[in-house]
A protein has these predicted regions:
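Macromolecular interaction modules
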Residues: 1-228
Length: 228
Protein backbone atom coordinates (compact mmCIF):
# COMPACT_ATOMS: atom_id res chain seq x y z
CA UNK A 1 0.00 0.00 0.00
CA UNK A 2 1.00 3.60 -0.50
CA UNK A 3 0.72 6.01 2.42
CA UNK A 4 0.99 9.77 1.97
CA UNK A 5 1.48 12.44 4.62
CA UNK A 6 1.40 16.23 4.68
CA UNK A 7 3.85 17.62 7.23
CA UNK A 8 4.44 20.98 8.84
CA UNK A 9 7.39 22.02 11.00
CA UNK A 10 10.63 23.97 11.25
CA UNK A 11 12.95 20.93 11.29
CA UNK A 12 11.59 18.87 8.42
CA UNK A 13 14.78 19.00 6.37
CA UNK A 14 16.85 17.54 9.19
CA UNK A 15 14.28 15.01 10.39
CA UNK A 16 13.08 13.63 7.05
CA UNK A 17 16.50 13.14 5.48
CA UNK A 18 18.03 11.47 8.54
CA UNK A 19 19.39 7.99 7.87
CA UNK A 20 17.77 6.84 11.09
CA UNK A 21 14.28 7.48 9.67
CA UNK A 22 15.03 5.32 6.63
CA UNK A 23 16.32 2.55 8.88
CA UNK A 24 13.21 2.71 11.07
CA UNK A 25 10.88 2.59 8.07
CA UNK A 26 12.80 -0.32 6.55
CA UNK A 27 12.59 -2.20 9.85
CA UNK A 28 8.80 -1.87 9.67
CA UNK A 29 8.78 -3.39 6.19
CA UNK A 30 8.70 -0.26 4.02
CA UNK A 31 10.22 -0.75 0.57
CA UNK A 32 10.25 2.81 -0.76
CA UNK A 33 10.30 6.36 0.61
CA UNK A 34 9.59 9.53 -1.33
CA UNK A 35 10.16 12.98 0.14
CA UNK A 36 8.70 16.05 -1.55
CA UNK A 37 9.92 19.09 0.34
CA UNK A 38 9.35 22.81 -0.11
CA UNK A 39 13.01 23.83 0.05
CA UNK A 40 15.34 26.54 -1.23
CA UNK A 41 15.58 24.94 -4.67
CA UNK A 42 11.92 25.71 -5.35
CA UNK A 43 11.71 28.99 -3.43
CA UNK A 44 11.26 31.04 -6.66
CA UNK A 45 8.14 29.06 -7.68
CA UNK A 46 5.25 31.42 -8.25
CA UNK A 47 2.29 29.04 -8.08
CA UNK A 48 1.50 28.45 -4.39
CA UNK A 49 -1.91 28.03 -2.80
CA UNK A 50 -2.83 27.09 0.76
CA UNK A 51 -6.04 26.51 2.69
CA UNK A 52 -4.17 26.08 5.99
CA UNK A 53 -2.89 28.66 8.46
CA UNK A 54 0.63 27.65 7.43
CA UNK A 55 1.55 26.13 4.04
CA UNK A 56 2.39 22.44 3.92
CA UNK A 57 6.16 22.00 4.28
CA UNK A 58 6.55 18.50 2.87
CA UNK A 59 4.66 15.55 1.44
CA UNK A 60 6.07 12.13 2.35
CA UNK A 61 5.07 8.88 0.63
CA UNK A 62 5.81 5.43 2.07
CA UNK A 63 5.21 2.07 0.38
CA UNK A 64 4.52 -0.59 3.00
CA UNK A 65 2.16 -3.59 3.36
CA UNK A 66 1.06 -2.86 6.94
CA UNK A 67 2.26 -1.14 10.16
CA UNK A 68 0.40 2.04 9.17
CA UNK A 69 0.10 3.28 12.76
CA UNK A 70 3.83 2.83 13.36
CA UNK A 71 4.70 4.80 10.21
CA UNK A 72 2.32 7.55 11.28
CA UNK A 73 4.02 7.64 14.66
CA UNK A 74 7.48 8.03 13.14
CA UNK A 75 6.41 10.92 10.94
CA UNK A 76 4.44 12.56 13.74
CA UNK A 77 7.67 12.62 15.75
CA UNK A 78 9.47 14.30 12.84
CA UNK A 79 7.02 17.19 12.46
CA UNK A 80 4.94 19.72 14.35
CA UNK A 81 1.78 18.61 12.56
CA UNK A 82 0.88 15.66 10.31
CA UNK A 83 -2.06 14.67 8.13
CA UNK A 84 -2.00 11.18 6.62
CA UNK A 85 -3.84 9.03 4.10
CA UNK A 86 -3.85 5.60 2.46
CA UNK A 87 -4.09 6.18 -1.29
CA UNK A 88 -4.75 4.37 -4.53
CA UNK A 89 -2.05 5.40 -7.02
CA UNK A 90 -2.55 6.00 -10.76
CA UNK A 91 0.28 7.10 -13.05
CA UNK A 92 -0.96 8.67 -16.30
CA UNK A 93 2.67 9.71 -16.94
CA UNK A 94 5.23 7.65 -14.97
CA UNK A 95 7.90 9.96 -13.51
CA UNK A 96 11.45 9.31 -14.78
CA UNK A 97 13.62 7.25 -12.48
CA UNK A 98 16.24 9.18 -10.53
CA UNK A 99 19.27 7.98 -8.60
CA UNK A 100 18.64 6.79 -5.07
CA UNK A 101 18.35 9.75 -2.71
CA UNK A 102 19.26 12.27 -5.43
CA UNK A 103 17.06 15.27 -6.16
CA UNK A 104 15.02 14.82 -9.34
CA UNK A 105 15.73 17.49 -11.95
CA UNK A 106 12.21 18.85 -11.78
CA UNK A 107 9.76 21.16 -10.14
CA UNK A 108 7.46 18.67 -8.45
CA UNK A 109 4.10 20.30 -7.86
CA UNK A 110 1.80 18.68 -5.30
CA UNK A 111 -1.89 19.51 -5.11
CA UNK A 112 -4.38 18.50 -2.43
CA UNK A 113 -7.85 18.16 -3.97
CA UNK A 114 -11.24 18.07 -2.25
CA UNK A 115 -14.67 16.99 -3.45
CA UNK A 116 -16.97 20.03 -3.68
CA UNK A 117 -20.03 20.10 -1.44
CA UNK A 118 -22.99 18.55 -3.20
CA UNK A 119 -20.96 16.52 -5.71
CA UNK A 120 -21.12 12.73 -5.65
CA UNK A 121 -17.75 11.00 -5.22
CA UNK A 122 -18.20 8.79 -8.28
CA UNK A 123 -19.09 11.79 -10.43
CA UNK A 124 -16.10 13.70 -9.05
CA UNK A 125 -13.78 10.83 -9.90
CA UNK A 126 -15.22 10.59 -13.40
CA UNK A 127 -14.77 14.31 -14.07
CA UNK A 128 -11.26 14.31 -12.64
CA UNK A 129 -9.75 11.04 -13.84
CA UNK A 130 -11.74 10.40 -17.02
CA UNK A 131 -12.32 13.92 -18.36
CA UNK A 132 -9.60 16.13 -16.88
CA UNK A 133 -6.55 13.87 -17.17
CA UNK A 134 -6.26 14.32 -20.93
CA UNK A 135 -6.72 18.09 -20.60
CA UNK A 136 -3.94 18.32 -18.01
CA UNK A 137 -1.56 16.34 -20.21
CA UNK A 138 -2.38 18.35 -23.34
CA UNK A 139 -2.17 21.80 -21.74
CA UNK A 140 0.92 21.51 -19.51
CA UNK A 141 4.60 20.62 -19.92
CA UNK A 142 4.39 17.75 -17.45
CA UNK A 143 6.78 14.80 -17.78
CA UNK A 144 5.50 13.00 -14.69
CA UNK A 145 1.88 12.79 -13.51
CA UNK A 146 0.71 10.77 -10.51
CA UNK A 147 -2.87 10.73 -9.21
CA UNK A 148 -3.42 9.49 -5.65
CA UNK A 149 -7.01 8.94 -4.58
CA UNK A 150 -7.61 8.79 -0.83
CA UNK A 151 -9.18 5.51 0.32
CA UNK A 152 -8.61 5.90 4.07
CA UNK A 153 -7.51 8.62 6.48
CA UNK A 154 -4.76 7.92 9.01
CA UNK A 155 -5.01 11.05 11.16
CA UNK A 156 -7.59 13.52 12.41
CA UNK A 157 -8.23 16.61 10.28
CA UNK A 158 -6.78 14.95 7.16
CA UNK A 159 -9.03 16.90 4.81
CA UNK A 160 -8.15 15.84 1.30
CA UNK A 161 -9.76 13.48 -1.18
CA UNK A 162 -6.79 13.20 -3.53
CA UNK A 163 -3.15 14.22 -3.85
CA UNK A 164 -1.71 14.92 -7.29
CA UNK A 165 1.97 15.14 -8.22
CA UNK A 166 3.10 16.70 -11.50
CA UNK A 167 6.70 17.13 -12.66
CA UNK A 168 7.65 20.22 -14.67
CA UNK A 169 10.91 21.65 -16.01
CA UNK A 170 12.61 23.83 -13.39
CA UNK A 171 12.06 26.86 -15.63
CA UNK A 172 8.33 26.45 -14.99
CA UNK A 173 8.83 28.00 -11.54
CA UNK A 174 8.83 31.48 -13.07
CA UNK A 175 8.05 31.07 -16.78
CA UNK A 176 4.40 30.39 -17.70
CA UNK A 177 5.43 29.22 -21.17
CA UNK A 178 7.70 26.59 -19.60
CA UNK A 179 4.85 25.55 -17.29
CA UNK A 180 2.24 25.22 -20.02
CA UNK A 181 4.54 24.14 -22.85
CA UNK A 182 3.32 26.93 -25.10
CA UNK A 183 6.70 27.58 -26.74
CA UNK A 184 6.68 31.35 -26.24
CA UNK A 185 3.38 31.80 -28.13
CA UNK A 186 1.23 34.10 -26.00
CA UNK A 187 -1.98 33.21 -27.84
CA UNK A 188 -1.34 29.50 -27.32
CA UNK A 189 -0.53 30.17 -23.67
CA UNK A 190 -3.86 31.93 -23.23
CA UNK A 191 -5.71 29.08 -24.92
CA UNK A 192 -4.07 26.48 -22.68
CA UNK A 193 -4.67 28.45 -19.49
CA UNK A 194 -8.33 28.97 -20.37
CA UNK A 195 -8.83 25.30 -21.18
CA UNK A 196 -7.16 24.26 -17.94
CA UNK A 197 -9.25 26.64 -15.81
CA UNK A 198 -12.45 25.50 -17.48
CA UNK A 199 -11.58 21.84 -16.86
CA UNK A 200 -10.51 22.22 -13.22
CA UNK A 201 -13.69 24.12 -12.41
CA UNK A 202 -15.80 21.08 -13.35
CA UNK A 203 -14.56 19.04 -10.37
CA UNK A 204 -13.69 21.73 -7.83
CA UNK A 205 -9.93 21.92 -8.36
CA UNK A 206 -10.07 25.67 -8.97
CA UNK A 207 -11.08 26.36 -5.34
CA UNK A 208 -10.36 24.84 -1.92
CA UNK A 209 -7.07 23.44 -3.16
CA UNK A 210 -3.50 23.44 -1.84
CA UNK A 211 -0.61 23.69 -4.31
CA UNK A 212 2.89 23.04 -2.95
CA UNK A 213 6.03 23.41 -5.11
CA UNK A 214 8.61 20.85 -3.99
CA UNK A 215 11.89 19.10 -4.62
CA UNK A 216 11.51 15.34 -5.10
CA UNK A 217 13.73 12.63 -3.56
CA UNK A 218 13.15 8.87 -3.77
CA UNK A 219 14.83 6.18 -1.64
CA UNK A 220 14.85 2.43 -2.22
CA UNK A 221 14.60 0.91 1.26
CA UNK A 222 14.87 -2.75 0.30
CA UNK A 223 18.59 -2.88 1.07
CA UNK A 224 18.53 -0.69 4.18
CA UNK A 225 19.49 -2.42 7.42
CA UNK A 226 19.34 -0.95 10.94
CA UNK A 227 22.74 -0.11 12.37
CA UNK A 228 21.65 -0.49 15.96
Amino acid sequence: MKLMYALWGSRLQEALFAERLREQLAALGATRLQINIADADVAPAQLRLTTYEQPVGAIVSVWIPDEFAAVTGLLTAAADRVAGWVVDERTPIPPPESDNGVRADALAGLALLRIPAGMDRSEWLRRWQDDHTTVAIETQATFGYVQNTVIETLTADARADALVEELFPMAAMTDPHAFYGSGGDDAELGRRVSRMIESTSTFGASTDVDVIPTSRYVYDLTGVRPTG
